[in-house]
């Protein structure tokens, strides 16, 4: 597989949506009750959402699903799910799918895409903040309840809300130069690289929960003081660090929850 062999396109057919459901099961190993059903993909396509697929030949190897929302009279997109097959990861495919979402949103006059992500997932946080230019200033505790996915490790499904302001200086500078604008970090929140092993093993899961609870408190306190997540660092040992400070741009919709 090469990056050039994977083609991205909109999904509109029932066959495409069946492939999305199957890939979702493969990636997260959800129970049937927790899968986003085929009908939801159909609805998203019909009501102004996005179902973007990535295909290696005839085989779907990734997809992105979003649904439209409104806040204070502004239309935005909530990107609910992005999946990439294991053998196609770490090659930039997730970022390509997000950029396809951005292109489509801007063509329709939409300036904001949001999504949730697990703050314990180091690679995903780095993609969202450093490769896409999202920020975060909201934190939801146990948003989806305890799920059956092994990736969650039986922990509460705490989530940061990524705000991707598509026409912000931060995003446009990153896409034009490959670098985010300089930031002033006022505090940081750390995630140890061992978090994946700790979540996977019942005997060490309490360590992962301690990290989650400590970081939850730090995020909530920082956000209550007007700080935002504006950067992310990884060190040579793959430990992660959220960088928090005051975001100097004024993009916001009122009544954000």
Where are these regions (language model features)?
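C-terminal "cap" of GNAT-fold acetyltransferases
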Residues: 142-175, 245-254
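Conserved catalytic-core motifs of GNAT/GCN5-like acyltransferases
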Residues: 116, 126, 133-150, 231-234
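A conserved beta-turn-beta hairpin within the catalytic core of GNAT-like acetyltransferases
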Residues: 69-79, 89, 111, 184-188
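A conserved beta-strand-loop-helix scaffold within acyl/acetyltransferase catalytic domains
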Residues: 6-84, 230-236, 246-249
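Conserved glycine-rich acetyl-CoA-binding loop
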Residues: 85-96, 108, 121
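Conserved GNAT acetyl-CoA-binding A-motif
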Residues: 105-118
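A short, well-structured alpha-helix characteristic of acyl/acetyltransferase catalytic modules
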Residues: 1, 13-26, 171-187, 219, ...
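A conserved mid-domain beta-alpha-beta active-site/ligand-binding segment of alpha/beta enzyme cores
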Residues: 158-213
């Amino acid at each position: 597989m090469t990056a050039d062999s994977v083609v991205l396109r909109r999904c509109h057919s029932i066959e495409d949506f069946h492939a999305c459901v199957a890939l979702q099961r493969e990636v997260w190993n959800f129970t049937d009750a927790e899968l986003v059903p085929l009908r939801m993909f159909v609805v998203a396509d019909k009501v102004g959402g996005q179902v973007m697929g990535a295909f290696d030949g005839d085989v779907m190897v990734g997809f992105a699903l979003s649904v439209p929302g409104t806040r204070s009279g502004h239309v935005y997109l909530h990107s609910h799910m992005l999946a990439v097959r294991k053998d196609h990861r770490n090659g930039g495919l997730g970022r390509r799918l997000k950029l396809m979402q951005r292109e489509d949103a801007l063509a329709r006059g939409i300036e904001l895409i949001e999504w949730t992500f697990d703050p314990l997932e180091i690679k995903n946080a780095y993609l969202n903040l450093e490769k896409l230019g999202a920020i975060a200033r909201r934190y939801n505790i146990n948003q989806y309840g305890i799920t059956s996915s092994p990736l969650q490790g039986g922990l509460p499904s705490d989530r940061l809300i990524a705000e991707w302001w598509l026409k912000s200086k931060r995003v446009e500078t990153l896409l034009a130069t490959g670098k985010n604008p300089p930031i002033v970090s006022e505090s940081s929140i750390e995630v140890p690289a061992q978090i994946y092993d700790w979540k996977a093993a019942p005997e060490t899961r309490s360590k992962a929960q301690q990290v989650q609870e400590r970081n939850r408190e730090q995020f909530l306190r920082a956000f209550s003081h007007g700080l935002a997540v504006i950067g992310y660092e990884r060190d040579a040992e793959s430990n992660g660090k959220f960088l928090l400070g005051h975001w100097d741009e004024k993009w916001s919709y009122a009544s954000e929850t």
